[in-house]
């Protein structure tokens, strides 16, 4: 017989809002979160050595800054994402998200490890 487990997501408070972690399975290498960002708040420019992420903008509007790793000058490209937009972030891609409006983002990724986040700047 198939077993299933009902559970509540884990809420993690952040300076920019909070995360609702509804899945983080190391054995099967996947993670699911909802990132809630308060208007005008952003998380640090950072990257992951192992983790790959896909963002789906559930509601609101965000600005995503991507650091160009091929540029010697550290060029940054800025992209506005609206509800319904998706963004794939490969491992090692520095990124920062700022909420233009209060926003919810569904994050689907490989397994999340706290020690796999490398901050470049706040």
Please identify what each model-predicted range represents.
Residues 50-70:
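Glycine- and acidic-residue-biased ligand/ion/polar-headgroup-sensing regions
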Residues 34-35, 46-47, 52-57, 79, ...:
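His/acidic/aromatic-lined binding-pocket segments of jelly-roll/cupin-type domains
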Residues 68-92:
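Short acidic-glycine-tyrosine-enriched beta hairpin
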Residues 1-33, 42-44, 75-79:
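A short, N-terminal "cap"/entry segment at the start of jelly-roll beta-barrel domains
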């Amino acid at each position: 017989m198939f077993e299933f487990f009902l559970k509540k997501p884990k809420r993690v408070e952040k300076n920019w809002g909070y995360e609702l972690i509804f899945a983080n399975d190391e054995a099967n290498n996947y993670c699911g979160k909802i990132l809630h960002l308060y208007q005008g708040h952003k998380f640090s420019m950072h990257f992951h050595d192992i983790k790959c992420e896909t963002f789906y903008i559930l509601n609101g509007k965000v600005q995503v800054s991507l650091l160009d790793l091929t540029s010697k000058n550290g060029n940054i490209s800025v992209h506005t994402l609206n509800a319904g937009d998706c963004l794939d972030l490969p491992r090692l891609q520095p990124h920062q998200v700022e909420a233009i409006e209060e926003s919810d983002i569904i994050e689907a990724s490989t397994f999340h490890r706290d020690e796999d986040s490398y901050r470049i700047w706040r």
